[in-house]
A protein has these predicted regions:
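Short, Gly/Pro- and small/polar-rich lid/capping loops
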Residues: 18-35, 41
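Charge-rich, well-structured scaffold segments of protease-associated domains
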Residues: 2-14, 18, 32, 43, ...
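A conserved active-site cap/scaffold subdomain adjacent to cofactor or substrate pockets
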Residues: 265, 277-300
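M16/MPP (pitrilysin/insulinase) zinc-metallopeptidase core fold and M16-derived inactive scaffolds
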Residues: 46, 51-115, 294-323
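Short beta-strand-initiation
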Residues: 25-26, 252-256
Length: 465
C-alpha cells in the first residue's frame, strides 16, 4: 500500500515520540557512512517484519521564503514516478510485495518509511532511495499536485485546531522560518516551479542530514551495506548544518484574534517560549504539563479530580456549569526552541476570560510552589506510562529513533529516559515554572467568538503573578 501520511496525524508531546521501550532483548546499533549518513537499527527478536525509513533533517523550516511550501510539495511528487519506475510500476511493485509506504513533512523533518516483510527489506530500501534521489518531477505531475495541494489547503482552513496553531507560530516567530506554515501560503503554492523543487533537494538532501533507520527483523551489517549501496553517493554538506540557519529564534509576545461568528466553538491557544528537544529541562516541562493536565467535557470530572484546572473547566461556571469544552497542556519542541502552553475550546457564548484566569491561576500555583509531591509523582508515573504505551510497534520505535538522531544527534536509552524522569523533584518543577513562566512574554491565537478574551496587556500582567 502506498500512501502519504496526513500532516494532521503528527503528534503533540504525547505524539512527538521521543522514547523507546524494551522489547525482548532488543539490540540498538549505529554506524556513520563516509558521507555522514547515519545508519541505525534496533533488532526485535521474534518478529518477521520491519520498518525501514529515511529521516531527513529538513522540513518547511528549510524552505526558501520566496517558495514556502516546497518541502511539502516535494512529498506529494515523490510517488508520481522516478527515472527508474513509472508511477504505475511503483504502485504495482509495492502492492505485489505487500509493503506499506508512507511519508510526511513537518517543520523540521521530511520522512519516508515503509513497513515490510523480512524478505523484502532490501527491495524497500531500493524503492526509498529511488523516491528520494530519482524522482522525475515532471511538469504535468507538478501541475496536477498543485491543484491537490490547494484543495488540501482549503481543508486545513476548516481544521480550526490546525489554524490556531499555524497562527500561533506566525505571531510567536513572525517572519522567522518557524513562523511559516508547512503547506505554504496559497499564493506561493501557485507559483512553485520545478527549479524550486530541484534546488530544495540539492540544498537539503545531504548525507550528514539523513538517517536510514531499520527496526524489527533487521541485521545491522546488512543495513549498512544497503545504505552504502543506495545512499553512499549522496554528497555531504559543504559546511555543518544548523537547523535555524543562524542565531536562535526570537519568541515574540504577540497575538492574533479572528472573530468568526459562524463557528459554534471558539479555539484558543496560549504559549510561552518552550523547550527544545535537547533542552536539559525537557522532561521537567513534561512533568509540569502533566500536573496541569488534559480534559474533555465528554469524560466529565469529579470535584476530587487530581487536576484543579480540570475541575474549574468542568464546574467553574455559574451553577457549577462548564467554562470550557476541552483543554490540553502541550509542548511543541524544535531543534533550538519550542512552544509551550494551553490550548482550549469553548462554546461560542462562553466567557473566555474565566478559563484564561483559571490557566493563569494554575501557572501561578506552579510558580508559588503550591503543588504537592503526590502531584509530581503522579505526573511522572503518567509520563513514563504514556511513553511506553506510545511505542508499541516497529514503526513507532523507528519514528522515535529517527526523530532523535536527526534533531539532536543522539538517542537516549530507555534507562536514561526513566532515570531523568524519576530524578525530577517538586523543587525542580517549581524552579522550572519560575524560569520558564515568570514574567515571560506570552503569545495568543484565537478563532471564533473572541469578544470575551481579555486584552494582551491583561495576559502579560498575569504572567507576573
Amino acid at each position: 500500500m502506498l500512501a502519504r501520511a496526513s500532516r494532521f496525524s503528527r503528534s503533540t508531546i504525547a505524539g512527538r515520540r521521543l522514547f523507546t521501550t524494551a522489547s525482548p532483548v532488543p539490540t540498538f546499533q549505529t554506524s556513520v557512512l563516509p558521507n555522514g549518513l547515519t545508519v541505525a537499527s534496533e533488532s526485535m527478536p521474534g518478529t518477521r517484519t520491519a520498518t525501514v525509513g529515511v529521516w531527513i533533517n529538513a522540513g518547511s523550516r528549510a524552505d526558501n521564503p520566496a517558495s514556502s511550501g516546497t518541502a511539502h510539495f516535494l512529498e506529494h511528487l515523490a510517488f508520481k514516478g522516478t527515472n527508474k519506475r513509472s508511477q504505475l510500476n511503483l504502485e504495482l511493485e509495492i502492492e505485489n510485495i505487500g509493503s506499506q509506504i508512507n511519508a510526511y513533512t513537518s517543520r523540521e523533518n521530511t520522512v519516508y518509511y515503509t513497513k515490510c516483510l523480512e524478505t523484502d527489506i532490501n527491495q524497500n530500501i531500493d524503492i526509498l532511495s529511488d523516491l528520494l534521489t530519482k524522482s522525475k518531477l515532471e511538469e504535468r505531475a507538478i501541475e496536477n499536485e498543485r491543484h491537490v495541494i490547494l484543495q488540501e489547503s482549503d481543508e486545513v482552513d476548516k481544521m480550526y485546531d490546525e489554524v490556531v496553531f499555524d497562527h500561533l507560530h506566525a505571531v510567536a516567530f513572525k517572519s522567522q522560518d518557524l513562523g511559516r506554515t508547512i503547506l505554504g501560503p496559497r499564493e506561493l503554492i501557485k507559483t512553485i516551479q520545478r527549479d524550486d523543487l530541484v534546488n530544495y533537494i540539492t540544498t537539503n538532501y545531504k548525507g550528514d542530514r539523513m538517517a536510514l533507520i531499520g527496526v524489527g527483523c533487521v541485521n545491522h551489517e546488512d543495513l549498512v551495506k544497503q545504505a552504502q549501496k543506495y545512499f553512499g553517493d549522496i554528497k555531504k554538506s559543504e559546511k555543518p548544518f544548523k537547523q535555524s540557519g543562524g542565531d536562535l529564534p526570537v519568541f515574540y509576545g504577540d497575538e492574533i484574534r479572528i472573530q468568526d461568528d459562524s463557528l459554534p466553538t471558539t479555539h484558543v491557544a496560549l504559549a510561552v517560549e518552550g523547550v527544545s528537544w535537547s533542552a536539559p529541562d525537557f522532561f521537567t516541562a513534561s512533568v509540569a504539563n502533566g500536573i496541569i493536565g488534559t480534559w474533555d467535557r465528554s469524560i466529565g470530572v469529579g470535584s476530587n479530580s487530581p487536576s484543579p484546572l480540570a475541575v474549574t473547566a468542568a464546574i467553574g461556571g455559574a451553577g457549577n456549569t462548564p467554562i470550557a469544552n476541552s483543554y490540553m497542556a502541550y509542548t511543541t519542541s524544535y531543534a533550538d526552541t519550542g512552544l509551550m502552553g494551553v490550548y482550549f475550546t469553548a462554546d461560542k457564548d462562553a466567557n473566555l476570560k474565566l478559563f484564561i484566569d483559571a490557566v493563569m491561576k494554575e501557572w501561578a500555583r506552579l510558580k508559588s510552589g503550591d503543588i504537592t509531591v503526590e502531584e509530581v509523582e503522579r505526573s511522572k508515573a503518567q509520563l513514563k506510562a504514556s511513553l511506553v504505551l506510545a511505542l508499541d510497534d516497529s514503526t513507532a520505535i523507528a519514528e522515535d529513533i529517527g526523530r532523535q538522531l536527526v534533531n539532536t544527534g543522539f538517542r537516549l536509552s530507555p534507562e536514561e529516559v526513566f532515570e531523568r524522569v524519576e530524578a525530577i523533584t517538586k523543587k525542580d518543577v517549581i524552579d522550572w515554572a519560575n524560569y520558564r513562566l515568570k514574567d515571560k512574554p506570552i503569545a495568543l491565537s484565537a478563532v471564533g467568538n473572541v469578544k470575551t478574551l481579555p486584552s494582551h496587556q491583561y495576559l502579560t500582567k498575569g504572567m507576573s503573578l
